[in-house]
Protein backbone atom coordinates (compact mmCIF):
# COMPACT_ATOMS: atom_id res chain seq x y z
CA UNK A 1 0.00 0.00 0.00
CA UNK A 2 2.81 2.41 0.94
CA UNK A 3 4.72 1.81 -2.31
CA UNK A 4 1.55 2.36 -4.34
CA UNK A 5 1.16 5.78 -2.71
CA UNK A 6 4.78 6.70 -3.46
CA UNK A 7 4.47 5.56 -7.07
CA UNK A 8 1.27 7.58 -7.45
CA UNK A 9 2.97 10.68 -6.01
CA UNK A 10 5.87 10.23 -8.42
CA UNK A 11 3.53 9.87 -11.39
CA UNK A 12 1.57 12.96 -10.34
CA UNK A 13 4.81 14.93 -9.83
CA UNK A 14 6.06 13.98 -13.28
CA UNK A 15 2.73 14.86 -14.88
CA UNK A 16 2.62 18.24 -13.10
CA UNK A 17 6.21 18.94 -14.18
CA UNK A 18 5.42 18.17 -17.81
CA UNK A 19 2.15 20.12 -17.93
CA UNK A 20 3.41 23.18 -16.02
CA UNK A 21 6.40 23.40 -18.38
CA UNK A 22 4.04 23.38 -21.36
CA UNK A 23 1.74 25.96 -19.73
CA UNK A 24 4.62 28.32 -18.90
CA UNK A 25 6.10 28.13 -22.38
CA UNK A 26 2.83 28.44 -24.29
CA UNK A 27 0.41 30.38 -22.09
CA UNK A 28 2.46 32.71 -19.86
CA UNK A 29 3.35 35.50 -22.27
CA UNK A 30 5.54 37.61 -20.01
CA UNK A 31 9.01 38.35 -21.40
CA UNK A 32 10.27 39.16 -17.89
CA UNK A 33 10.07 35.47 -17.01
CA UNK A 34 12.76 34.56 -19.51
CA UNK A 35 13.61 30.95 -20.31
CA UNK A 36 12.63 28.84 -17.31
CA UNK A 37 13.37 25.13 -17.03
CA UNK A 38 11.48 23.03 -14.52
CA UNK A 39 13.98 20.68 -12.94
CA UNK A 40 11.63 18.92 -10.55
CA UNK A 41 8.35 18.88 -8.67
CA UNK A 42 7.73 17.75 -5.08
CA UNK A 43 4.11 17.03 -4.24
CA UNK A 44 3.02 16.73 -0.61
CA UNK A 45 1.44 13.45 0.48
CA UNK A 46 -2.00 15.01 0.80
CA UNK A 47 -1.68 16.57 -2.71
CA UNK A 48 -2.41 20.04 -1.34
CA UNK A 49 0.95 21.64 -2.19
CA UNK A 50 3.50 21.26 -4.96
CA UNK A 51 6.98 22.78 -4.90
CA UNK A 52 8.14 23.46 -8.43
CA UNK A 53 11.92 23.73 -8.70
CA UNK A 54 12.95 25.96 -11.56
CA UNK A 55 16.17 27.19 -13.17
CA UNK A 56 16.76 29.92 -15.74
CA UNK A 57 19.19 29.47 -18.60
CA UNK A 58 19.30 33.16 -19.45
CA UNK A 59 19.67 34.68 -15.98
CA UNK A 60 22.72 34.79 -13.71
CA UNK A 61 21.84 37.67 -11.39
CA UNK A 62 20.00 36.57 -8.23
CA UNK A 63 17.80 39.69 -8.34
CA UNK A 64 16.59 38.85 -11.85
CA UNK A 65 15.98 35.25 -10.80
CA UNK A 66 13.97 36.29 -7.75
CA UNK A 67 11.95 38.74 -9.84
CA UNK A 68 11.14 36.05 -12.41
CA UNK A 69 10.10 33.64 -9.67
CA UNK A 70 7.90 36.36 -8.17
CA UNK A 71 6.20 36.83 -11.54
CA UNK A 72 5.62 33.08 -11.84
CA UNK A 73 4.29 32.98 -8.29
CA UNK A 74 1.83 35.76 -9.11
CA UNK A 75 0.73 33.78 -12.17
CA UNK A 76 0.43 30.55 -10.17
CA UNK A 77 -3.35 30.88 -9.87
CA UNK A 78 -3.68 31.08 -13.66
CA UNK A 79 -1.22 28.20 -14.11
CA UNK A 80 -3.11 26.14 -11.52
CA UNK A 81 -6.42 26.85 -13.31
CA UNK A 82 -5.00 25.61 -16.63
CA UNK A 83 -3.44 22.64 -14.85
CA UNK A 84 -6.81 21.73 -13.32
CA UNK A 85 -8.39 21.77 -16.78
CA UNK A 86 -5.77 19.38 -18.14
CA UNK A 87 -5.42 16.92 -15.23
CA UNK A 88 -7.84 14.43 -13.79
CA UNK A 89 -7.39 15.17 -10.07
CA UNK A 90 -9.99 15.91 -7.44
CA UNK A 91 -7.93 18.81 -6.13
CA UNK A 92 -5.01 20.42 -7.89
CA UNK A 93 -2.17 21.36 -5.54
CA UNK A 94 -1.23 24.94 -4.72
CA UNK A 95 1.89 25.76 -6.71
CA UNK A 96 4.98 27.19 -5.02
CA UNK A 97 7.88 28.12 -7.28
CA UNK A 98 11.41 27.77 -5.89
CA UNK A 99 14.78 28.33 -7.50
CA UNK A 100 16.84 25.16 -7.95
CA UNK A 101 20.44 25.81 -6.97
CA UNK A 102 21.63 22.31 -7.90
CA UNK A 103 22.59 23.28 -11.47
CA UNK A 104 24.84 26.13 -10.31
CA UNK A 105 26.33 23.96 -7.58
CA UNK A 106 27.04 21.23 -10.13
CA UNK A 107 28.80 23.71 -12.39
CA UNK A 108 30.93 24.91 -9.45
CA UNK A 109 31.90 21.33 -8.58
CA UNK A 110 32.82 20.58 -12.22
CA UNK A 111 35.01 23.70 -12.33
CA UNK A 112 36.75 22.69 -9.10
CA UNK A 113 37.38 19.18 -10.41
CA UNK A 114 38.74 20.50 -13.71
CA UNK A 115 41.10 22.83 -11.80
CA UNK A 116 42.52 19.85 -9.89
CA UNK A 117 43.52 18.07 -13.10
From Swiss-Prot:
It is found in: Cytoplasm. The lineage of its organism: Bacteria, Pseudomonadati, Pseudomonadota, Gammaproteobacteria, Enterobacterales. GO terms for molecular function: ribosomal small subunit binding. This is Ribosome-binding factor A. One of several proteins that assist in the late maturation steps of the functional core of the 30S ribosomal subunit. Associates with free 30S ribosomal subunits (but not with 30S subunits that are part of 70S ribosomes or polysomes). Required for efficient processing of 16S rRNA. May interact with the 5'-terminal helix region of 16S rRNA. Gene3D superfamilies: 3.30.300.20. GO terms for cellular component: cytosol. It comes from the Bacteria. The keyword Cytoplasm applies. HAMAP family: RbfA (MF_00003). Monomer. Binds 30S ribosomal subunits, but not 50S ribosomal subunits or 70S ribosomes. It holds the Pfam family RBFA. Keywords: Cytoplasm, Ribosome biogenesis. Belongs to the RbfA family. PANTHER family: RIBOSOME-BINDING FACTOR A, CHLOROPLASTIC-RELATED. It comes from Blochmanniella floridana. The gene is rbfA. One of its GO terms (biological process) is maturation of SSU-rRNA.
